């Protein structure tokens, strides 16, 4: 079975990070939350992660242009996977896809039905 749709139960600091990184790697991701208030707390975390990822890509892009050694964040891939502006563009596209492919939901039943894999990241 090929996993395509991942559900992360919980959108706190850890859940948001798991969800964004999973979406960055190309999966469709839904974050299941318990309340409207949780949505309001999760959205800024996701926006922050989006901005952090873009800033990291910009840093790598500047190093590439300057001919400096490249140090990619671990979740971005191996340093030798970025050799050109086209590779940088692919990273930017992955961040945009991640943002687009993240969904927030309050409907646990629907999330469970659609999920190929569920990751639990809820407060105890």
Q: Which residues make up each language-model segment?
A:
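Aromatic pocket-lining residues of Rossmann-like dinucleotide-binding sites
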Residues: 22
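A short, basic/flexible loop-to-alpha-helix module at the beginning of a structural domain
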Residues: 1-4, 109
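Glycine-rich Rossmann-fold phosphate-binding loop(s) that bind the pyrophosphate
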Residues: 11-12
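Hydrophobic Val/Ile/Leu positions in short beta-strands of Rossmann-like dinucleotide-binding domains
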Residues: 7-8
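N-terminal Rossmann-fold NAD(P) dinucleotide-binding loop
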Residues: 15-16
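Short beta-strand element of Class I
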Residues: 29
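Rossmann-like NAD(P)-binding element
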Residues: 34-41, 52-124
């Amino acid at each position: 079975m090929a996993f395509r749709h991942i559900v992360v139960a919980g959108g706190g600091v850890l859940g948001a990070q798991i969800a964004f990184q999973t979406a960055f790697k190309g999966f469709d991701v839904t974050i299941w939350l318990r309340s409207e208030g949780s949505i309001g707390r999760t959205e800024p975390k996701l926006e922050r992660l989006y901005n952090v990822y873009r800033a990291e890509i910009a840093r790598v892009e500047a190093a590439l242009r300057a001919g400096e050694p490249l140090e990619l964040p671990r979740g971005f891939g191996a340093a030798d996977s970025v050799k050109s502006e086209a590779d940088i563009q692919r990273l930017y596209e992955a961040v945009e896809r991640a943002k687009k492919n993240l969904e927030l939901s309050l409907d646990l039943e629907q999330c469970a039905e659609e999920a190929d894999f569920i990751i639990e990241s809820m407060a105890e």
